[in-house]
Amino acid sequence: MKMKKYVSHRFLQLIPILLGITFLSFAMMRLAGSDVVTEMYQNRGTEVSQEIIDAKRAELGLDQPFLIQYGRWLGGMLTGDMGESYMTGKPVFPTFLSKLPATLLLTALSIILTILVSIPFGILAAVTHDKIPDLILRFFSFIGNALPNFFVAMLLMQLLSIRLQLLPVISDGVTLKSAWMPALTLAVSMSAKYMRQVRAAVLEEWNKDYVQGAWARGVRSRVILWKNVMKSSMLTIITLLALSIGNLLGGTAIIESIFMWDGVGKLAVDAITMRDYPVIQAYVVWMAIIYVLVNLITDLLYHRLDPRIRLGVTKG
């Protein structure tokens, strides 16, 4: 099977997955049992008659059978029309797009910080196995894994914002300076987890027969590490990065709320609180697309890096 055929086949597989996710999420929200129109007016602090509520429900199509509602929404989504927010009355798609720059900036900065910390220290812990550097790094990795993100956020606020006054506590807009605090908070836990995984992957490769054979032939340790061990360990690192990128692009609701970072995660939390179904549905679609694409890209990277997988594709 050629690579183009493989990619086309994977894309075709994604269509029923996305349709299934949108259908289930749409059904679950409709089965919640609450009257969206009544809550919408209550949240706005407006008292209206039952006639107005019924008219609004008909305007939004909420008086139609479930399948008709889903079909109308799906048809609109395919043309870029995700409806209007029940709470603000603004189009959902532009509102969602306006939050993406903040989420993309936070994702990129968090991933960069995580890579810069976890990979070098993970390698150092592996090559100094059971020695003092390894023990120290494993201790800090354990602490980083144990601390919840909101607690790390409070510690960083106290240290970097209140005492040292280096960074702002609350975001004053989508700027690089405001992104440092939430990005550092996310990077602490991710770096701790990644460092352990990188260490384990490097140690596993380091103890394999081909590495021992290279040692016996007099190949230098540095060459073995970077040319052989790290190349084989990249699959583990790519898997971890793919999962984290998916989570980060979906927004990190707690961290965004703590630092008032105006990203996708905060938008989703506000929508869930207000039962703003069109915005919630847009968020579900976004998350589904992100995870599907991230998994596809990860598979393609696997084929690129692992000759055994690539061989299986070409012969399939």
Locate each region found by the language model:
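Hydrophobic alpha-helical transmembrane segments of membrane transport/permease proteins
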Residues: 18-71, 165-181
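Membrane-water interface segments at transmembrane-helix boundaries in multipass membrane proteins
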Residues: 138-200
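Alpha-helical transmembrane segments of integral membrane proteins
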Residues: 4, 96, 100-133, 174-316
